[in-house]
């Protein structure tokens, strides 16, 4: 038996599907029927006469109460793959639309996509119903892209002002020479499809477009992308761009990398691409962890590229000219004497008087006045994470025999591992040869081979990497050391699985690379030395 509610719903549906003329005539006949009062014979006759030419109509309206949470169209109508369009997907439309001018062939394409987001995505870079076009890119590299004013205005306040504001101009074509086509397409894809598609080679241009057209969520995504891909190779360029885009968080992240990995950053190709203002900021930096001769050589490399940018001959005079007052930000008097004598003094950039005065600064009791900053940079103070609560030694251990001691660790903030603190001999002074290594998922990130002397105490002795290694948060890295020495060594006890070092939390776990007995509870590699 059909449920009453279901019957009423079917009646309501049937009524709504009737033509308006039928509905109106039906309602009039109903009024006539009710005029006669409570069910007299004349009323019945009138009703029968009135409806003789029309089918009986059921238009009872019931009240629908929705107590449950409102569902979206996709929840009510789960997406099904049409039998006659097996290859038609939103992803394929996105791929097709990257090449522009794609009209939808199916007359009922709207029915293929249950959500407004999916239907909107079909319009991305599509000439169908487009009411504006953009000519994007510099002369000689332009691309004509279609747009839909309503969609663009919903996604950007700048587009809203352009198309619907008080000063809106009714233009069918808008030229945008200062934005790259790929970046503009990435912004359109976000506005139309609610998808963020970023690439390393276009993310800066996309950030510029997002800033220009005030699309804040896309801009934030670009900044996050840049932060996660930040390294010594691109830190200087990103520093310059972050200042231009007024992104203080990204600027701070760049400085952290540049300070800790200063020599790598200064030797990178990107350093030569920075503007003069950024160059001054870096040369003025108090916390650079770099030898001053490296800073000097980096400045000369920048000057050479700057001469090319200004179409100047590559002469010593022009290099000094483009450096200008920034030359005096290099702390030449703080170099090691050998570095100065064999490097800066013979570069030709310094005048004869400057060279003589700096030599006197090194050797004379009465030092001359210099235009150069003569105070050494402070650099960064390394932090030490000690993972053992005590150490000990016994008559039959710890021996090495060329075996690997290894431990895995993870941090909750980005840090830069500068080296390890290692134990020394428990039998008096001794020399050790140490090969230290840092890996992530089997890939070697840093290694070094060096020697160190121990004095017989239970202290730890630092062994450094050539350059600090950047460590990303929430990922386990493997620290390994192979020691070679004849004497017995101290070893750690009462190891901790988690250690708090300032604002950084370090977690430890055993490593399968360890073949000499080191683990979380005891063994070697008692300290991680890092910058944070």
UniProtKB/Swiss-Prot annotation:
Residues 130-200 form the BTB domain. This is BTB/POZ domain-containing protein 3. The keyword Cytoplasm applies. Residues 245-310 form the BACK domain. The lineage of its organism: Eukaryota, Metazoa, Chordata, Craniata, Vertebrata. Its main location: cytoplasm. Keywords: Cytoplasm, Neurogenesis, Nucleus. Acts as a key regulator of dendritic field orientation during development of sensory cortex. Also directs dendrites toward active axon terminals when ectopically expressed. One of its GO terms (cellular component) is cytosol. The keyword Nucleus applies. Residues 23-54 are annotated as: Disordered. PROSITE patterns: BTB (PS50097). Expressed in visual cortex. Expressed in visual cortex layer IV neurons. Residues 43-53 have a biased composition (Low complexity). One of its GO terms (biological process) is cerebral cortex development. Pfam families: BACK, BTB, PHR. PANTHER family: BTB/POZ DOMAIN-CONTAINING (PTHR45774), BTB_POZ DOMAIN-CONTAINING PROTEIN 3 (PTHR45774:SF2). It is found in: Cytoplasm, Cytosol; Nucleus.
């Amino acid at each position: 038996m059909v449920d009453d509610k279901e019957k009423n719903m079917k009646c309501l549906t049937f009524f709504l599907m009737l033509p308006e003329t039928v509905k109106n005539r039906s309602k009039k006949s109903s009024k006539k029927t009710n005029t006669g009062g409570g069910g007299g014979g004349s009323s019945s006759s009138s009703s029968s006469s009135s409806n003789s030419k029309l089918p009986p109509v059921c238009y009872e309206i019931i009240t629908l109460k929705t107590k449950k949470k409102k569902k979206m169209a996709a929840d009510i109508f789960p997406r099904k793959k049409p039998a006659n369009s097996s290859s038609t997907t939103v992803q394929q439309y996105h791929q097709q639309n990257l090449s522009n001018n794609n009209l939808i062939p199916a007359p009922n394409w709207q029915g293929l996509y249950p959500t407004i987001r999916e239907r909107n995505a079909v319009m991305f870079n599509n000439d169908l119903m487009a009411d504006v076009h953009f000519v994007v890119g510099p002369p000689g590299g332009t691309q004509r892209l279609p747009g839909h004013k309503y969609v663009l205005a919903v996604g950007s306040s700048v587009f809203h002002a352009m198309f619907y504001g008080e000063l809106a101009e009714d233009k069918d074509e808008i030229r945008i020479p200062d934005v790259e086509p790929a970046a503009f397409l990435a912004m359109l894809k976000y506005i139309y499809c609610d998808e963020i598609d970023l690439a390393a080679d276009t993310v800066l241009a996309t950030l510029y477009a997002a800033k220009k057209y005030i699309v804040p969520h896309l801009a934030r995504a670009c900044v996050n992308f840049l932060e996660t891909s930040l390294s010594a190779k691109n830190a200087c360029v990103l520093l310059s761009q972050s200042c231009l885009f007024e992104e203080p968080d990204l600027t701070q992240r760049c400085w952290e990398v540049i300070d800790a990995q200063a020599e790598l950053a200064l030797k990178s190709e990107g350093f030569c691409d920075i503007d003069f203002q950024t160059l001054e900021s870096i040369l003025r930096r108090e916390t650079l962890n770099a030898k001053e001769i490296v800073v000097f050589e980096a400045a000369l490399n920048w000057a050479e590229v700057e001469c090319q940018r200004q179409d100047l001959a590559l002469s010593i005079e022009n290099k000094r000219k483009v450096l200008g007052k920034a030359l005096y930000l290099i702390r030449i008097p703080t170099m090691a004497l050998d570095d100065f004598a064999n490097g800066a003094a013979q570069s030709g950039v310094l005048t004869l008087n400057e060279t003589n005065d700096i030599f006197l600064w090194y050797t004379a009791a009465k030092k001359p006045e210099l235009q150069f900053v003569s105070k050494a940079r402070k650099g960064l103070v390394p932090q030490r994470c000690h993972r053992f609560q005590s150490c000990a030694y016994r008559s039959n251990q710890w021996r090495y025999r060329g075996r690997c001691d290894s431990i895995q660790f993870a941090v909750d903030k980005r840090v830069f591992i500068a080296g390890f603190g290692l134990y020394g001999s428990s039998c008096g002074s001794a020399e050790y040869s140490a090969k230290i290594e840092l890996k992530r998922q089997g890939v070697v990130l840093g290694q070094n081979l060096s020697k160190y002397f121990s004095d017989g105490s239970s202290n730890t002795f630092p062994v450094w990497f050539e350059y600090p290694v950047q460590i990303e948060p929430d990922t386990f890295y493997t620290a390994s050391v192979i020691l070679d020495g004849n004497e017995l060594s101290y070893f750690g006890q009462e190891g901790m699985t988690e250690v708090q070092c300032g604002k950084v939390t370090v977690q430890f776990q055993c490593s399968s690379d360890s073949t000499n007995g080191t683990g979380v509870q005891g063994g070697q590699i008692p300290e991680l030395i890092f910058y944070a």
